[in-house]
Amino acid sequence: MPLVSMTEMLNTAKEKGYAVGQFNLNNLEFTQAILQAAEEEKSPVILGVSEGAGRYMGGFKTVVAMVKALMEEYKVTVPVAIHLDHGSSFESCAKAIHAGFTSVMIDASHHPFEENVATTAKVVELAHFHGVSVEAELGTVGGQEDDVIAEGVIYADPKECQELVERTGIDCLAPALGSVHGPYKGEPNLGFKEMEEIGKSTGLPLVLHGGTGIPTADIKKSISLGTAKINVNTENQISSAKAVRETLAAKPDEYDPRKYLGPAREAIKETVIGKMREFGSSNQA
């Protein structure tokens, strides 16, 4: 199946009451594990690529070529989107679009509102011309992700969310409502009241960033309030690192990367399968 944008995927998920996971790519093994999990679970999937991970893997074009080749090799039949995670500028989004990404996130949430609207609208115009979906963010998701550091959480303003959607034509919205990137210190405190209000007023599928460590009950509640995309990266990184440590602790003389990265790949796959089942996306493709 060819790569697709997120639009239909997320609208269907919102309608049917489940969420599609965005799982971030960090290297070959992450890409293999996530695609294998999606095909086995018969789940649609979004492959997230941050600017930093894109650079690490040799550029956006390299990532697209790798994903397409693996999809062919694994005979992938489920819908797959390649999505730029936290695109920092119009230029970065344009680069991803021209490299073959099927979806982009423009994150101008740290700029004043009017500037966020102007930048986002410009990205939407280019993206939609190429059949690419667009995600935008309002408020501030806490924690750190690659080049993006946000200390505290600034909740999104429901009225601004509605205005951003109306003035830009984005396909999905990531309102910051208490989630953070990276491991949580204590229990996450999600703003469900705001989530419900934003979901109703915009009518768009909502996106939950920082999906690692959010209790299942909160995940289910978020989905019931219109969240159709949940981002996961830290959990896969932790499980893969744990597998590498365990392998090397048991065999300190091991030097063949396949012998320690193989178990890491399996650990990622298991984690992703668990998330797909939790989000309700298994058997939806």
Curated annotation (Swiss-Prot):
Phosphorylated during sporulation. Keywords: Glycolysis, Lyase, Metal-binding, Phosphoprotein, Sporulation, Zinc. One of its GO terms (molecular function) is fructose-bisphosphate aldolase activity. Pathway: Carbohydrate degradation; glycolysis; D-glyceraldehyde 3-phosphate and glycerone phosphate from D-glucose: step 4/4. Catalyzes the aldol condensation of dihydroxyacetone phosphate (DHAP or glycerone-phosphate) with glyceraldehyde 3-phosphate (G3P) to form fructose 1,6-bisphosphate (FBP) in gluconeogenesis and the reverse reaction in glycolysis. This is Probable fructose-bisphosphate aldolase. The active site is at D85. D-glyceraldehyde 3-phosphate binds at S50. It comes from the Bacteria. Binds 2 Zn(2+) ions per subunit. One is catalytic and the other provides a structural contribution. PROSITE patterns: ALDOLASE_CLASS_II_1, ALDOLASE_CLASS_II_2. The modification Phosphothreonine is found at T212, T234. Belongs to the class II fructose-bisphosphate aldolase family. Transmembrane segments: none annotated. The keyword Ribonucleoprotein does not apply. Zn(2+) 2 binds at D107, E137. It catalyses: beta-D-fructose 1,6-bisphosphate = D-glyceraldehyde 3-phosphate + dihydroxyacetone phosphate. Dihydroxyacetone phosphate binds at G182, G210, G211, T212, N231, V232, N233, T234. Zn(2+) 1 binds at H86, H181, H209. Its EC number is 4.1.2.13. Its cofactor is Zn(2+). GO terms for biological process: fructose 1,6-bisphosphate metabolic process; glycolytic process; sporulation resulting in formation of a cellular spore.
